[in-house]
């Protein structure tokens, strides 16, 4: 059976690697919504104009991570704040690249954007 929302929430408690980037842009809400709609075709996505939460399954695209990862995005007036919670440092690094590439696709007029992961 497919994992339930509770299963997904419990898997989040096992995550060990987190990073946040404050990406300079005044179009954060637009990019957040476009990317959320794009990912909602294949991933569990919840979003509003200002907030998005995307769950990347541990076995997405043939991967074998120890737990699901969660990407949250918050649209601020001058930044798009992106946080990744992953199961390992390697998982985190892989998702940093995935997220940056996808945001840059929707932000093509001002890409590449600066992701100051910290």
Label the model's feature ranges.
Residues 10-31:
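Terminal, regulation- and interaction-focused segments at domain boundaries
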Residues 15, 19, 49-52, 76, ...:
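Structural preference for solvent-exposed beta-strand-turn elements
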Residues 25-27, 58-62, 86-88:
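Beta-strand elements of well-folded, non-transmembrane domains
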Residues 28-41:
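Amphipathic alpha-helical segments
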Residues 41-65:
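Ser/Thr-rich, low-complexity intrinsically disordered terminal regions
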Residues 62-86:
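Beta-strand/loop substructures that line and gate deep hydrophobic ligand-binding cavities in soluble
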Residues 83-117:
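C-terminal structural segments of small proteins and small subunits
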